[in-house]
Amino acid sequence: MKIAVDAMGGDNAPQAIVEGVMLAKQDFPDIEFQLYGKEAEIKKYITDEKNITIIHTDEKIASDDEPVKAIRRKKTASMVLAAQAVKNGEADAIFSAGNTGALLAAGLFIVGRIKNVERPGLMSTLPVMGEPDKGFDMLDLGANADNKPEHLVQYAVLGSFYAEKVRNVQNPRVGLLNNGTEETKGSELTKKAFELLAADETINFVGNVEARELLNGVADVVVTDGFTGNAVLKSIEGTAMNMMSLLKTAILSEGVKGKMGALLLKNALHGMKDEMDYSKHGGAVLFGLKAPVIKTHGATGPDAVRYTIRQIHTMLETQVVPQLVEYYEGKAE
């Protein structure tokens, strides 16, 4: 299997990206990595050249570039070349920590969506508290700001497919994010989506779920519109960061006693931090495209890159995308 890597994407590129690839090489000797970017800079961090190909380019897409314009005008940008490699069959998947909007555009306009998938969704696997090996898939997280009820139903299908094939969740429970659990709650969008989801016998729909319940594992797949999903994701990220910051401040404010207490609780505190770190589940997938297109956080480090490559390996190994293509071809007949 071959993975096209945008080595210049992200705040810490290319160092964090290449170091993460070096870690992943130890886990997956069957992967061939294509690193797109400035060859001289990339080579600084390569410790083993086996299964590594560098495709040199001086051009990259910046974090503040307008996504669609950047994809169209910067034809030799590292991200664009990586996406083209997937389109041309020279690579099986693309990974980037760069401009999210540009990667979404590259995924849609270059890699292409699966026939009969109207709106591919941006999806992440988020943690379930108290169960570190478990998680839930949530989409859409920002690929589509405006959605129709039918899109949310399609997200339920996409999320269920991923949960079952990639995360090995049998008959995944699907929840609709809403401002209350009652059937009558919500906007016109969620009310209509509720009706459609409840009527679809192929979806294991468990009803409305509230944001406060998400991390308790109330559902295996949570669907929502892209605007709401993105806001909820950032709220979860912000809450996690602030909790750790508050805890640190409280400990330091107690002086020596606080530091001694923290030392005694060191393992528990590390466990708490790890449990809230959803990067262990990999990156965000733009699911519904003809190949895996994966995005990680711009400030990602080597470990997060390693986890994301593990995720891509699983997606390719389980052939989840070809199975999804077959599923939608069958629905069209």
UniProtKB/Swiss-Prot annotation:
Catalysis: reaction(s):
a fatty acyl-[ACP] + phosphate = an acyl phosphate + holo-[ACP]
rRNA-binding in keyword set: no
Sequence similarity: Belongs to the PlsX family.
Q: Name one GO cellular component term.
A: cytoplasm
Q: What's in the keyword line of the UniProt record?
A: Cytoplasm, Lipid biosynthesis, Lipid metabolism, Phospholipid biosynthesis, Phospholipid metabolism, Transferase
For this protein, the record's Pfam families field holds: FA_synthesis (PF02504)
**Pathway field:** Lipid metabolism; phospholipid metabolism
Q: How does it associate, per the subunit comment?
A: Homodimer. Probably interacts with PlsY.
Task: Write the Enzyme Commission number(s) for this entry.
Answer: 2.3.1.274
Q: Which GO terms describe its biological process?
A: fatty acid biosynthetic process; phospholipid biosynthetic process
What HAMAP family does the entry give?
PlsX (MF_00019)
Q: What does this protein do?
A: Catalyzes the reversible formation of acyl-phosphate (acyl-PO(4)) from acyl-[acyl-carrier-protein] (acyl-ACP). This enzyme utilizes acyl-ACP as fatty acyl donor, but not acyl-CoA.
Read off the Gene3D superfamilies from this record.
Answer: Isopropylmalate Dehydrogenase
Enzyme class (EC, first level) = transferase
Q: What is this protein called?
A: Phosphate acyltransferase
Q: Where in the cell is it found?
A: Cytoplasm
Annotated Gene Ontology MF terms? Answer: phosphate:acyl-[acyl carrier protein] acyltransferase activity
Query: Its gene?
Result: plsX
